[in-house]
Amino acid sequence: MVLCGDMHRVFEIGPVFRAEDSNTNRHLCEFTGLDIEMVFYEHYFEILDLLADMFVAIFNGLEERYAKELKVVGEQYPFEPFKCKNVRLSFKEGVKLLADNGFTQDPLQDLSTENEKTLGRLVREKYDTDFYMLYGYPTNARPFYTMLDPHDDNYTNSYDFFMRGEEITSGAQRIHEPEFLAKRAAHHGIPVATIQEYIDAFKYGCPPHGGCGIGLERVVKLYCGIRNIRKCSLFPRDPKRLRP
């Protein structure tokens, strides 16, 4: 809605509350989120360019400004230095890399957690980096408001970023045409009447855009090689912990 008001880049940092029953070492019910939405002019890769540059700047800044603090963390929680190169692969290339090394992955389904970690290891071996991005995810693995690939509607204009074999953010080009948005919602079995206000917002005119949401505690966890995300939050909240 803000982009409809001709603000072409929107950034927000703040608390996020997610009532998700995910008892894992990488999920929290409360965390600090960095949300980004932006207009692009020629191709949704413009979003990937900005995000990649942002992450690289963050990682380089941590090394330059907080080397002393990172050393202290490493004394209690030893970790390998984070390797960062700007590597971009298509989802199909990721599937091929897995297949070439004897791992099975359906090209029209999302990566399993196990295959995410395996692919992260293979990417590190091949490209010498702990940071990379995959783009062009299958349509079956994305929500209804994700723009389809204009050349193959089995895939989408979407992307994930990874650190040490774990996803740190998912994003995509959003559908900005109200008629197509309603059609995709109906295709997914969502009653259009229940989201009519959302669809109506695009009737005022909205440029092509996309973005993502990033959980900063997970970024810290993976940068420092910490096994449990609860170590990265002062007062962690998960489905079984409300206090202190």
PLM features: residue spans?
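Class II aminoacyl-tRNA synthetase catalytic cores and aaRS-like
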Residues: 1-244
